[in-house]
Design a protein with these regions (language model features):
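Short, small-residue-biased leader/transition segments that mark boundaries at the very start
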Residues: 1-8
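Nucleotide-sugar donor-binding and catalytic loop/hinge architecture
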Residues: 16-34
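Catalytic donor nucleotide-activated moiety binding site of glycosyltransferases and closely related
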Residues: 38-46, 51, 69-72, 76-117
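Short, flexible/disordered intra-domain loops and linkers
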Residues: 46-61, 113-122, 144-147
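Well-ordered, non-membrane alpha-helical segments in soluble/globular domains
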Residues: 55-74, 124
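Donor nucleotide-activated moiety binding/catalytic core segment of transferases
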Residues: 62-64, 104-141
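A donor-sugar binding/catalytic signature common to diverse glycosyltransferases
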Residues: 125-168
């Protein structure tokens, strides 16, 4: 609801720590608005989450990457004067997407439940979440091989943004 969104915007429930604000300020994101694009692969491209099996053949992995890159190219074309910031749980994809004119934030990618370096991973998770919440558009890219995440959905809710989906 609008009232709930106002509570989030005023940061009555969630207030970033000084450390988180410092990390966000280092991101150099356009204050006039940027588009956040979020993709959640789980183990579709690499195996980093224990007991989460989504093993694809090399051909199917490449096909999925190409479909996602095509989707991001479409988003770039539709948002010519905006920064496009890509968020993902896949190191492989974040490296591949750098061929496009997009921003990928620094930090250790991982899932808090599956890592030993939890502080660095947790900070990256919070930076991503808050950066997504401050975007002017939030687009979640989905495919049958990908995880139907709500991470970016809730970040959009925090920012009072209507989340969008692009199926590839």
């Amino acid at each position: 609801s609008s009232a709930a969104s106002d509570v989030y915007k005023r940061q009555e429930l969630f207030k970033p720590s000084q450390a988180l604000n410092e990390c966000l300020n280092c991101c150099s994101l356009d204050s006039s608005g940027y588009v956040a694009v979020h993709l959640r692969f789980v183990n579709a491209l690499e195996n980093f989450e224990k007991d989460q099996f989504n093993s694809l053949t090399e051909d199917k992995r490449e096909n999925l990457i190409q479909r996602c890159l095509k989707g991001i190219r479409l988003i770039i074309d539709q948002n010519k004067n905006k920064q496009i910031v890509v968020f993902s749980d896949s190191k492989v994809f974040l490296e591949r997407v750098k061929v496009l004119p997009v921003i990928v934030l620094d930090g250790k990618v991982g899932h808090i439940s599956f890592t030993e370096n939890t502080h660095e991973v947790a900070m990256k998770t919070f930076v991503d979440f808050y950066a997504i919440s401050k975007a002017c558009r939030v687009i979640r890219i989905l495919a049958p091989e990908m995880y139907n995440t709500v991470f970016s959905y809730y970040a959009a809710v925090l920012g009072g943004i209507i989340p969008e989906e692009l199926h590839v």
